[in-house]
């Protein structure tokens, strides 16, 4: 499990890939010693479709504060975005027509690098997925059951172990 017997695939833009190689050089040598994660690093570009097996994946530009990062549209039906504070208009357009959106919603109060719950609700409303699941919440978000009651019927606070069928 967790890459012990197989490479862990990581799909990132060139900037992130360079930082991973610089900060974790021991993962990218020819002979990796026991206990070191085996990483398969694949560089991708925002707006350029790639495939994982036969599934189409579209990387989307989003911002983590001032740091450009990637979110993903997977298989045309799933959007996955974490660590986002805002996204450009083009990325909103690329997320239209989703069945499921998984997106970060850190806490009620604003944060410089993550969406607040109200910002996430606004972004989710603009995207218009059939179902939205908020992830990456802090302990400041409040109790799961209390927050869930305040969300629209198609928006949910995710939880560990959640499985989504769509």
Where are these regions (language model features)?
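Cap/insert and terminal regions of metallo-dependent hydrolase folds
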Residues: 86-166
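Binuclear metal-dependent hydrolase catalytic cores
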Residues: 1-80, 146-166
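Switch II (G3) loop of P-loop NTPases
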Residues: 80-86
């Amino acid at each position: 499990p967790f890459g012990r017997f197989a490479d862990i695939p990581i799909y990132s833009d060139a900037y992130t890939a360079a930082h991973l190689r610089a900060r974790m050089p021991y993962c990218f040598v020819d002979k990796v010693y026991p206990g070191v994660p085996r990483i398969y690093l694949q560089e991708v570009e925002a707006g350029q479709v790639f495939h994982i097996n036969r599934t189409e994946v579209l990387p989307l530009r989003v911002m983590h504060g001032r740091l450009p990062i990637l979110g993903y549209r997977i298989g045309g039906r799933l959007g996955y975005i974490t660590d986002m504070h805002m996204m450009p208009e083009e990325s909103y357009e690329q997320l239209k027509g989703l069945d499921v959106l998984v997106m970060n919603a850190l806490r009620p109060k604003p944060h410089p690098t993550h969406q607040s719950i109200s910002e996430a609700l606004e972004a989710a409303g603009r995207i218009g997925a059939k179902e939205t699941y908020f992830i990456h919440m802090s302990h400041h978000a409040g109790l799961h059951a209390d927050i869930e009651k305040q969300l629209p019927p198609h928006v949910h606070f995710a939880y560990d172990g959640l499985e989504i069928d769509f």
